[in-house]
């Protein structure tokens, strides 16, 4: 049974968030956490927070299962564009430039690994 966590209205551009989301897509949860901890991108904090929430949601949905981070993997992660705030910046000769402050919605779906690899 899969679990989902959504982080909405994050004040980061979707393009920057997709860079971090691509790093952890399809990885096991423990490996994804290690990647996010060592990432220098500011969006990695939001992805880490949402990933922890998805793992907690999995534990709530499946209370009889004891699952570690090694047994879970990120089934899907996608970033959608949120609302765009439009602001103006004064420009020379009485003009104004438009600034678009973008936001995004992050969705992470985790699931249990079907055939865990044993070493």
UniProtKB/Swiss-Prot annotation:
Gene3D superfamilies: Ribosomal protein L22/L17. GO terms for molecular function: rRNA binding; structural constituent of ribosome. Keywords: Ribonucleoprotein, Ribosomal protein, RNA-binding, rRNA-binding. GO terms for cellular component: cytosolic large ribosomal subunit. The keyword Kinase does not apply. It comes from the Bacteria. InterPro entries: Ribosomal_uL22, Ribosomal_uL22_bac/chlpt-type, Ribosomal_uL22_bac/org-type, Ribosomal_uL22_sf. SUPFAM superfamilies: Ribosomal protein L22. One of its GO terms (biological process) is translation. PANTHER family: CHLOROPLAST 50S RIBOSOMAL PROTEIN L22-RELATED (PTHR13501), LARGE RIBOSOMAL SUBUNIT PROTEIN UL22M (PTHR13501:SF8). Belongs to the universal ribosomal protein uL22 family. Part of the 50S ribosomal subunit. This protein binds specifically to 23S rRNA; its binding is stimulated by other ribosomal proteins, e.g. L4, L17, and L20. It is important during the early stages of 50S assembly. It makes multiple contacts with different domains of the 23S rRNA in the assembled 50S subunit and ribosome. The globular domain of the protein is located near the polypeptide exit tunnel on the outside of the subunit, while an extended beta-hairpin is found that lines the wall of the exit tunnel in the center of the 70S ribosome. This is Large ribosomal subunit protein uL22. It comes from Chlorobium phaeobacteroides (strain DSM 266 / SMG 266 / 2430).
